[in-house]
Design a protein with these regions (language model features):
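Short alpha-helical transmembrane segments in multi-pass integral membrane proteins
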Residues: 1-23, 81-148, 190-246, 302-367, ...
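N-terminal transmembrane alpha-helices
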Residues: 10-47, 61-76, 80, 84, ...
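Transmembrane helical elements of multi-pass membrane transporters/channels
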Residues: 21-40, 142, 153, 176, ...
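Helix-terminus/linker motif at the lipid-water interface of multi-pass membrane proteins
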Residues: 31, 35-53, 123-130, 186-193, ...
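Membrane-helix interface/capping residues of multi-pass secondary transporters
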Residues: 41, 50-53, 90, 119, ...
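Small-residue-rich hydrophobic transmembrane alpha-helices
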Residues: 53-113, 150-169, 263, 276-340, ...
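Hydrophobic transmembrane alpha-helices of multi-pass small-molecule transporters
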Residues: 65, 180-185, 210-214, 286-289, ...
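Short runs within selected transmembrane alpha-helices of multi-pass transporters and secretion channels
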Residues: 74, 142-161, 169-177, 198-213, ...
């Protein structure tokens, strides 16, 4: 009954209600992800040891590789399932959902094993110094043990939205992230476990988040399935998910890899520069994460409209989403810019690290006003099943454009040039997204 009501929202609710009812829980969930990402750095910052802050800045992009792989099955599964439900193919949607679950388990176990085996090589690659090596090793060793749970939590926070259950999707993230935030000060400061405490809290939060989604399906609350008997790779189940999921995940994967590359390049200028860039990126995350949530929240609605071939409703939903996204990112960018100094000072106490953090954040905020429109367009492409266009946009912003810009500008303007590479990539990738979306729209008319 509850799922039927959710489908009614997709099909018949007023546009504003349909968009906001799906987008707001997703945005709230991403806010919790933001808080979760800030928590480790914040509470480690309270130890007044900026070397530990630098170690977390080095280790976080590596850990985010787990989340990136989870989005292969999460975003890919959401796109395929939402279109299948729009077409009335409920049994096919069940097969896709089960495929996503068991793929997360298998790939998560494999990734955990590889990370633990090659830990020292990974630390050398990310630019850990003699001062940050042990801290980064401790953190990564602990969090790497939670691979399958991280993949499941990140996958199903997306997939459940495909049947209109944005509130349930948000709740799983809320529980896991809230628990992490609660445990961080206890384990870091009260128990005195420092960076190891942060890692343990992260593991527990992901286990609880994944457990919530598993229980949701086992209780029969969903019209979808994670049962092994529904698992299949045939009928374009695997290829359908991967065709959309890999382009989306490549964007996140390249985000992690480019952050690793940024840290290794920034390490030439010292550990405080690494700490500064890590915190500066967290300042801009306050805008980007909310806009990512908005884009992910409207994707199932757009996908349903595509499956139902209701193009008038699709266009109205997209127009409202784009306007709302632009206004939202403008407000968030202004807030972050006005309070950059105060935000950075919460995480960093060293004067040099603070100066790096503020100046780097101001540069990155130059283009954060574009985030809302960019992420809505990317998700609109995914909702249309535009695998090729989605792939091009995602690998451009964090790879094809960003990485060359980082090397070129870094060679000319040193540490400041490294930071300016991201705004350059933001502008060019948005222009590319607009061109590809317009071309895709003309082809479908």
């Amino acid at each position: 009954m509850e799922n039927n009501k959710s489908m009614e929202v997709f099909a018949k609710a007023p546009i504003r209600k349909a968009v906001l009812q799906n987008a707001l829980p997703a945005m709230a969930a991403m806010l919790m992800v933001l808080i979760y990402n800030l928590a480790d750095t914040f509470f480690i910052g309270q130890t007044h040891d900026d070397l530990q802050v630098a170690a977390v800045s080095l280790a976080t992009p590596v850990f985010l590789l787990f989340m990136s792989v989870g989005t292969v099955f999460g975003i890919g599964g959401t796109s395929v399932i939402s279109r299948a439900l729009g077409e009335g193919r409920k049994n096919y949607a069940k097969k896709v959902c089960s495929f996503c679950m068991w793929s997360c388990v298998a790939v998560g176990v494999l990734m955990s094993a590889l990370f633990l085996i090659f830990m020292d090589q990974i630390l050398a690659l990310i630019g850990a110094s003699a001062e940050t090596w042990d801290y980064a090793r401790t953190y990564l060793t602990i969090v790497s043990c939670s691979g399958p749970f991280v993949l499941i939590a990140n996958c199903y926070s997306n997939v459940i939205r495909a049947e209109g259950q944005s509130g349930k999707a948000m709740m799983g993230q809320l529980l896991g992230n809230l628990l992490n935030v609660i445990l961080d000060p206890i384990m870091i400061l009260v128990f005195g476990w420092n960076i190891a405490g942060a890692a343990i809290a992260t593991v527990i939060g992901n286990v609880v988040g994944a457990g919530y989604y598993i229980i949701y399906f086992l209780k029969g609350s969903s019209s979808l399935s994670i049962s092994l008997k529904d698992f299949s790779v045939k009928e374009k189940v695997a290829s359908g998910v991967l065709a959309i999921g890999i382009p989306a995940a490549l964007g996140n994967l390249l985000m992690s890899l480019s952050s690793i590359l940024m840290n290794s390049q920034m390490a030439k200028y010292g550990d405080m520069a690494v700490a500064g860039v890590g915190v500066a990126m967290k300042v801009t995350m306050m805008t980007s994460m909310v806009c990512i949530g908005l884009g992910q929240g409207v994707q199932p609605l757009l996908g349903y409209c595509v499956g139902a071939k209701n193009w008038e409703r699709y266009r109205s939903s997209l127009k409202f989403s784009l306007i709302f996204a632009f206004l939202l990112s403008a407000v968030l960018t202004l807030i972050c810019y006005l309070f950059t100094g105060q935000i950075v000072s919460v995480f960093l106490t060293d004067a040099a690290a603070y100066d790096y953090g503020v100046s780097f954040a101001h540069i990155l905020l130059c283009t954060s006003i574009l985030f809302g429109v960019f992420y809505v367009l990317v998700n609109a492409l995914q909702a249309r099943g535009a695998a090729t266009e989605s792939l091009i946009v995602n690998i451009s912003r964090q790879g094809l454009i960003y990485i060359p810009a980082m090397f070129i500008l870094g060679a000319i303007f040193h540490e400041t040039g490294l930071i300016w590479a991201q705004p350059v990539a933001d502008v060019l990738s948005l222009l590319l997204a607009i061109v590809l979306y317009v071309r895709k729209t003309k082809k479908m008319l």
